């Protein structure tokens, strides 16, 4: 019955969920971040992840905090000259023709009834400047676009206003939109396309080489036009070392890299059987997946090689009061599989405890590998060779087959190939040395115009878990 109502009124449920954040599935978590490391720490408000499938919900991807700016709201603005310095940007001025409308105070209800203010004050394409003198019965409005007003409203202004005329209006830098400001500094033939992501008060850019000369102008615009942004940084290199850190530079604002971000769960897919499950997070970072899953009652074993990331994960777990459900490890992933998962017989239904944390006998084990650059290649460690022989070692070769828990693998990866399914299949075969009987590949998001992120999901075959040759 509940499923019937959900399917029938799915769109309505989404709208209600978006409008009432903390009524529906409110979740507040806190995430911290290291300055030197850029393992970004947040005071987290978790965005919608489907923890049935452990990946971002495609239907809700538009809610993620990513800003893509274009010139769609300022198509009529063409700058006469490009700005190249911060001083020029700060002192920018131009003159534009605007429409001045003057009415008497007693006419305000009439104009309001005919949607004058809905078509001006509330319309970003037709902004309004309002001049009011409390000692006078006169009200003056400067309209940006007379031609955008509905014809009946234009007729009303013509007939009922004291005056409507064209005036020259001074426009300053603080008056223009973000898109117009970008048009002043970006000079190319592909339009204004400046993207950035936000984490709390931090805006994170990936400025391409061709725009490096104007990166500080871009940062200045972002920090001026988005009042919640206090710090703008640029990633100067790819994530490159074993700790997955990156080289960043401060472009504008405060040198404060500790971000606080509260994320509300707006809409999510959740199975109540999830409370019986165990999440094994191989590359947990500062703990976003681990904390979210534990908030839903899931037991979690979370590992990260980076000691700073593991430290912040422990701190976030304490802040979010889920320490009874999350165990943190700071180990190499291969050692984690052998010394924690295998030696503790985590895949054995008879194992009901790990380091003081209770495990459910009936629960499945979800292995999440969110390190897209190398996760596929790391899958090969599910089957390892004995160091002194060619014998294969499986994670569950020390467990009776009838007592084995199911292991569901969620492996994230990148691909730049148009035939990504074929390319991923080849990489899977090369990594684990056999064909998987069944798996799914789901598109997660676009990383760049030529690179996409995918999630590979499959139930790990018993032959792999027991270390059997194909």
Swiss-Prot record:
SUPFAM superfamilies attached to this UniProt entry: S-adenosyl-L-methionine-dependent methyltransferases (SSF53335)
Binding sites annotated in the UniProt record for S-adenosyl-L-methionine: 304-305, 332-333, 370
InterPro entries: MeTrfase_TRM5/TYW2, SAM-dependent_MTases_sf, TRM5-TYW2-like_MTfase, TRM5/TYW2-like_N, tRNA_Gua_MeTrfase_euk
Pfam families linked to this entry: TRM5-TYW2_MTfase, TYW2_N_2
Location in the cell: Mitochondrion matrix; Nucleus; Cytoplasm
UniProt keyword annotations, A-Z: Cytoplasm, Methyltransferase, Mitochondrion, Nucleus, S-adenosyl-L-methionine, Transferase, tRNA processing
Molecular-function annotations in GO: tRNA (guanine(37)-N1)-methyltransferase activity
Main location: mitochondrion
Subunit structure: Monomer.
Role description: Specifically methylates the N1 position of guanosine-37 in various cytoplasmic and mitochondrial tRNAs. Methylation is not dependent on the nature of the nucleoside 5' of the target nucleoside. This is the first step in the biosynthesis of wybutosine (yW), a modified base adjacent to the anticodon of tRNAs and required for accurate decoding.
HAMAP family per record: TRM5
Protein name (database record): tRNA (guanine(37)-N(1))-methyltransferase
